[in-house]
Regions:
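Beta-strand-rich domains and repeat architectures in extracellular enzymes and scaffolds
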Residues: 17-49, 64-76
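Short coil/turn segments that connect the beta-strands within blades of beta-propeller domains
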Residues: 35-36, 79-81, 119-121, 164-165
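Short loop/turn segments that connect beta-strands within beta-propeller blades
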Residues: 54-58, 96-100, 136-139, 181-185
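Blade-loop segments of beta-propeller domains
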Residues: 58-94, 100-112
Length: 196
């Protein structure tokens, strides 16, 4: 019998249309642009924070620093709350978007890498090929999907975004972003960001 050939997944490129100054010492883990405001989650133990940044100048306008034991990771905006993960401490933080005051904490059983939402549930990655869907009020898992391309697992899923009905995940230590079907976990396309 003939061997079935794996179908090539479409790859898109990019065009840089604008550049902005940025704090070179910030180990960026998540970015959110909302109503003219730029929010950033930064990592590294002893240097992790959530900050509001002036897009045009790169100046930090507000900052909320994490305790030194936490390594900040991905972040998403849910209603008027910023939700930030930490890497290995299995602890997440909830902040008031306006004041950056920490208003709640929550826990999860895996590492925390990236987070986004689909307007109904939070979606979290842990560096594996699994995406976890969480209730945004209780932070309890509601389902999970395995991410694959041609039936092969795609792991190292890092920060996430929800774009036009798809989950976009950057792949740690690569220049690629996977476009993922949120129902099946199948990679439907790639963005190749080589050169940025």
């Amino acid at each position: 019998l003939p061997v079935a050939l794996a179908q090539e997944t479409a790859t898109c490129s990019y065009e840089v249309v604008q550049t902005y100054p940025h704090d070179q010492n910030a180990f960026t883990q998540g970015l959110i642009f909302d109503q003219g405001e730029l929010y950033e989650s930064t990592g590294l133990e002893g240097k992790s924070s959530v900050r509001k940044v002036d897009l045009e100048t790169g100046k930090v306008l507000q900052i909320s620093k994490l305790d030194d034991r936490y390594f900040g990771e991905g972040m998403t905006l849910w209603q008027d709350r910023l939700i930030q993960l930490t890497w290995v401490s299995k602890t997440g933080f909830v902040y008031d978007k306006e004041t950056l005051k920490q208003i709640a904490t929550f826990s999860y059983p895996t590492q925390g890498w990236g987070i986004t939402h689909n307007h109904q549930e939070l979606i979290m990655s842990d560096g594996s090929n699994t995406l976890y869907f969480l209730n945004p009020n209780t932070f309890k898992e509601t389902k999970r999907i395995k991410v694959t391309e041609n039936d092969r697992p795609i792991d190292k899923l890092n920060e996430l975004e929800f774009v036009k009905g798809e989950i976009w995940a950057n792949i740690w230590l690569s220049d690629r972003i996977a476009r993922i079907d949120p129902e099946t976990g199948v990679v439907t396309g790639w963005l190749d960001l080589t050169g940025i």
